[in-house]
Amino acid sequence: MSPKIRQTIYLLGTAAPALLGIVLIWGGLDAESAADLGDIIAGVVSILVSGAPAVAAGTVRSQRKDGTLSTSPVDQVTKGVEQVLAARQSAEAEVAKVKQALETAVSGSLPQLGPLATQILNVADDTVWRP
């Protein structure tokens, strides 16, 4: 998750409880329902709790400005090379599986060939005489 997305989530986490707290306080302080202190207390607590995401959002903002959350070009290249090497190893493993499957399939389908035919199939192209 990028620092900008985290900062946005923290800011939304700050605004939602604060707005809910204000609504609860206004609803609790209504003339008809002034006796309902539970809503008032819940509203005040909700406003106080909204301070934690505000602090987190401020921290992320300052970290983004001073470069704490950004990765260095060396780290980015190193991570990219590691990913390429991992992909290469995975591809080599898959190729080995395919070769093994082909060898199994070919050796299983050509048992009727004699030793001379097998030698002919195994000879390199440059060693065969051509007129």
Curated annotation (Swiss-Prot):
Keyword Transmembrane helix: yes
Gene Ontology cellular component annotations, sorted alphabetically: host cell plasma membrane; membrane
Alphabetized UniProt keyword annotations: Coiled coil, Cytolysis, Host cell inner membrane, Host cell lysis by virus, Host cell membrane, Host membrane, Membrane, Transmembrane, Transmembrane helix, Viral release from host cell
Topology term for the membrane: Multi-pass membrane protein
A GO molecular function held by the record: pore-forming activity
Subcellular location: Host cell inner membrane
Coiled coil location: 74-104
Family designation: Belongs to the Mycobacterium phage D29 holin family.
Function comment: Accumulates harmlessly in the cytoplasmic membrane until it reaches a critical concentration that triggers the formation of micron-scale pores (holes) causing host cell membrane disruption and endolysin escape into the periplasmic space. Determines the precise timing of host cell lysis. Participates with the endolysin protein in the sequential events which lead to the programmed host cell lysis releasing the mature viral particles from the host cell.
HAMAP family per record: HOLIN_D29 (MF_04168)
UniProt note: domains: The first transmembrane region undergoes a helix to beta-hairpin conformational change, which is responsible for its self-association and pore formation in the host membrane. The coiled coil region is required for host cell lysis and for cytotoxic activity. The C-terminus determines the size of the hole.
Protein known as: Holin
Species name: Mycobacterium phage L5
